[in-house]
Regions:
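Short, intrinsically disordered low-complexity segments
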Residues: 24-54, 59
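Residue-level detector of functional hotspots within protein domains
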Residues: 11-16, 41-43, 65-66
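C-terminal structural segments of small proteins and small subunits
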Residues: 46-82
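Extended, hydrophobic alpha-helical segments
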Residues: 1-27, 31-36
């Protein structure tokens, strides 16, 4: 994500933490079904200034290979990397 305002950035980070795991400073892995994804998008729109900020959502299809340790272990293959 790219959020111009510190207050909005903290709010968005806290929102994303409630859906998944922070893997880098502005990258989160979230295992989401369609309902949760739509909920996350709606809540993010209320936090973001869509004229200044950006949140990118990348659906991941297929297997994910992890080298090293991984705190996530969901069985559902449908997850989104933010």
């Amino acid at each position: 994500y790219d959020v111009a305002d510190d207050t909005r950035r903290v709010k968005l980070a806290n929102l994303l933490k409630s859906y998944g795991e922070r893997v880098q400073l502005s990258v989160f892995e979230c295992y989401l079904d369609e309902k949760l994804l739509q909920d996350l998008k709606a809540r993010a729109r209320r936090v973001l200034d869509l004229g200044q900020d950006a949140l990118r959502l990348y659906p991941v299809q297929g297997e994910v290979e992890v080298l090293g340790t991984s705190p996530l272990g969901a069985e559902d293959p449908a997850f989104v990397v933010l």
